[in-house]
């Protein structure tokens, strides 16, 4: 369904990402226009009207935003934060259900999707703060008082970080398969030690961004996504019969690697967080309810909910398992996921 209004074409400036110089512009078949078209294809089957706009924040940056049912004023808005390597388009299976009786906002995280892609700090704590402040500035710009904040993967980590710093703005925190909560286990404590060849490969790849391979692959990058992640096409098969989803993921991740570099600066080898959230979440305001949603078939450690409960023994913490779902819970079992999220939201108002 067409959007109600689009104020400008994109939060980006320039037809091509600035870092793609020399031979790379012809090597990587992408541009901000390609990403815009890919996003529009992702959203064309969303069964409700919405408004899309770039929200201006500090330093000339913009946060690309979708608003659903924003004219409903008596319900706390639900705000969706996507995960690493994603964008707001990946919520396409969820918008219709979630916005039936409350405002829903989704935006591309700073450095991802169609939001601005600035240079981030190299320090993990400062990177985290840059993300958190961009969310707070976005909230202020839209005039939202309080939010139900939902984050998947990296978005879950940032939603928790935001809730720690701005507790008065969060009525409920929903963590969906959150990244970055446990500490990296000591190799000596692991039942299955990491093979030497994997450690060697990890050391060799340390100077590079996580998705650099897609850009190095150039015109073969899209087929690489299709080969490595054929499951994404299946997840969205009820909405698209073609390669719409993989094209969107490809164009999201071959632009300037701004958020990707920021994520790398927040990690230590093998994807663990430099500043694990479980070390801090016990300091979260006790009145903030937390719901943790995970896929019963996910390969990610699903014990974060139990750990959070032990660290917040006098606060509301609930863990919800979605049967038949993996890490991408919202796409694997969208109807069940949407229902659980709506039930959580109904406890707020």
Swiss-Prot record:
The gene is ABHD5. One of its GO terms (biological process) is fatty acid metabolic process. It comes from Pongo abelii. Coenzyme A-dependent lysophosphatidic acid acyltransferase that catalyzes the transfer of an acyl group on a lysophosphatidic acid. Functions preferentially with 1-oleoyl-lysophosphatidic acid followed by 1-palmitoyl-lysophosphatidic acid, 1-stearoyl-lysophosphatidic acid and 1-arachidonoyl-lysophosphatidic acid as lipid acceptor. Functions preferentially with arachidonoyl-CoA followed by oleoyl-CoA as acyl group donors. Functions in phosphatidic acid biosynthesis. May regulate the cellular storage of triacylglycerol through activation of the phospholipase PNPLA2. Residues 77-184 form the AB hydrolase-1 domain. One of its GO terms (cellular component) is lipid droplet. One of its GO terms (molecular function) is 1-acylglycerol-3-phosphate O-acyltransferase activity. This is 1-acylglycerol-3-phosphate O-acyltransferase ABHD5. The keyword Cytoplasm applies. PANTHER family: 1-ACYLGLYCEROL-3-PHOSPHATE O-ACYLTRANSFERASE ABHD5 (PTHR42886:SF34), RE40534P-RELATED (PTHR42886). It is found in: Cytoplasm; Lipid droplet. Belongs to the peptidase S33 family. ABHD4/ABHD5 subfamily. Signal peptide: none annotated. The modification Phosphoserine is found at residue 122. The lineage of its organism: Eukaryota, Metazoa, Chordata, Craniata, Vertebrata. Acyltransferase activity is inhibited by detergents such as Triton X-100 and 3-[(3-cholamidopropyl)dimethylammonio]-1-propanesulfonate (CHAPS). Acyltransferase activity is inhibited by the presence of magnesium and calcium.
């Amino acid at each position: 369904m067409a959007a109600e209004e689009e104020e400008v074409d994109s939060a980006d400036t320039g037809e091509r990402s600035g870092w793609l110089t020399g031979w790379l512009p012809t090597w990587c078949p992408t541009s901000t226009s390609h990403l815009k078209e890919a996003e529009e294809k992702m959203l064309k089957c969303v069964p409700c009207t919405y408004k899309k706009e770039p929200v201006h924040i500090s330093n000339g940056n913009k946060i690309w935003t979708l608003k659903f049912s924003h004219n409903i004023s008596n319900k706390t808005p639900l705000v969706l934060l996507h995960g690493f390597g994603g964008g707001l388009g990946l919520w396409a299976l969820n918008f219709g259900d979630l916005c039936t009786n409350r405002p829903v906002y989704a935006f591309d995280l700073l450095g991802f999707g169609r939001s601005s892609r600035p240079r981030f700090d190299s320090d993990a704590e400062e990177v985290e703060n840059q993300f958190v402040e961009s969310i707070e500035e976005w909230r202020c710009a839209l005039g939202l008082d309080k939010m139900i904040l939902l984050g998947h993967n990296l978005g879950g980590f940032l939603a928790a970080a935001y809730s720690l710093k701005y507790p008065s703005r969060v009525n409920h925190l929903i963590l969906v398969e959150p990244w970055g909560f446990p500490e990296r286990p000591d190799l000596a404590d692991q039942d299955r030690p990491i093979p030497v060849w994997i450690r060697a490969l990890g050391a060799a790849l340390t100077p590079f961004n996580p998705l650099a391979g897609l850009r190095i692959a150039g015109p073969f990058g899209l087929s690489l996504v299709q080969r490595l992640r054929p499951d994404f096409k299946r997840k969205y098969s009820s909405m698209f019969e073609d390669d719409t989803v993989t094209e969107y993921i490809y164009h999201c991740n071959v632009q300037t690697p701004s958020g990707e570099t920021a994520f790398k600066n927040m990690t230590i080898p093998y994807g663990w967080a430099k500043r694990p959230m479980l070390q801090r979440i016990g300091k979260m305001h006790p009145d903030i309810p937390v719901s943790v949603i995970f896929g019963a078939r996910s390969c990610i450690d699903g014990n974060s909910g139990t750990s959070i409960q032990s660290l917040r023994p006098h606060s509301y913490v609930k863990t919800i398992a979605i049967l038949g779902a993996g890490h991408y819970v919202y796409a694997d079992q969208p109807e069940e996921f949407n229902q659980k999220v709506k039930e959580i939201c109904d406890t707020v108002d």
